[in-house]
């Protein structure tokens, strides 16, 4: 994997091998916009599948994302989706305890969004995992990641797809979480 930092635009270009529709690995260059990230919390098995199905009333809800992000992305227009797939993602299963707390065993996925499609009242979010991160670290450093764990049913306990106005690379660096992007 070759990674370049774009000092003028705040984006990161990643060259990696991705499977195409037939499963064959082909080179792909992805430009990541690190100014925001997807936080996807689900009850689905995130380790055996490469997509999440989210009902629309839990997708980019006005009360769970910034007003600017809601205005830009909630429509799921082709232009919005083209911009959203440039954000990295944290995909995780609902935490095991109240307030977003979990044990050391529960893992989240740091990855890339490959495709977003809306079908009736569902949104399919296809992703490519890059590495695992301990979900307990997200809980312990929730403020750094823009995650609210102040109530019993927190952001990590509630199935939802949100976009956080947090630079995921900086948050991971600040909290000592190793991901597959070099230090800047």
Name these PLM-found stretches.
Residues 1, 32-33, 82-84:
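Flexible, charged surface loops at secondary-structure boundaries
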Residues 1-28:
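Long, low-complexity intrinsically disordered regions enriched in small/polar
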Residues 2-5, 10, 122-184:
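Contiguous surface segments at macromolecular interaction interfaces
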Residues 3, 14-16, 39-41, 89, ...:
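Generic structural hydrophobic/aromatic packing signal, biased to beta-strands
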Residues 5, 34, 44, 48, ...:
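Generic intrinsically disordered, low-complexity segments enriched for polar/acidic and small residues
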Residues 14-18, 23, 48-51, 158, ...:
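Low-complexity, compositionally biased segments
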Residues 19-66:
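N-terminal helix initiation/capping motif
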Residues 57-142:
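Structured alpha/beta reader/binder surfaces that contact nucleic acids or chromatin modification marks
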């Amino acid at each position: 994997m070759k990674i370049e930092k774009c000092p003028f635009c705040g984006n990161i270009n990643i060259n990696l091998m991705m499977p195409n529709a037939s499963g064959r690995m082909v080179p792909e260059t992805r430009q990541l916009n690190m100014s925001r990230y997807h936080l996807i919390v689900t009850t689905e098995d995130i380790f055996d599948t490469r997509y999440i199905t989210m009902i629309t009333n839990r997708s980019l809800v006005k009360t769970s994302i910034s007003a600017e992000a809601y205005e830009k992305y909630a429509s799921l227009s082709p232009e919005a989706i083209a911009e959203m797939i440039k954000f990295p993602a944290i995909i995780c299963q609902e935490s095991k305890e109240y307030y977003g707390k979990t044990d050391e065993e529960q893992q989240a996925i740091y990855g890339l969004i490959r495709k977003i499609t809306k079908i009736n009242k569902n949104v399919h979010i296809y992703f490519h995992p890059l590495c695992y991160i301990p979900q307990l670290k997200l809980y312990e450093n929730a403020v750094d990641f823009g995650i609210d764990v102040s109530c019993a049913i927190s952001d990590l306990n509630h199935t939802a797809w949100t976009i956080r106005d947090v630079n995921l690379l900086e948050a991971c660096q600040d909290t000592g979480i190793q991901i597959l992007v070099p230090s800047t």
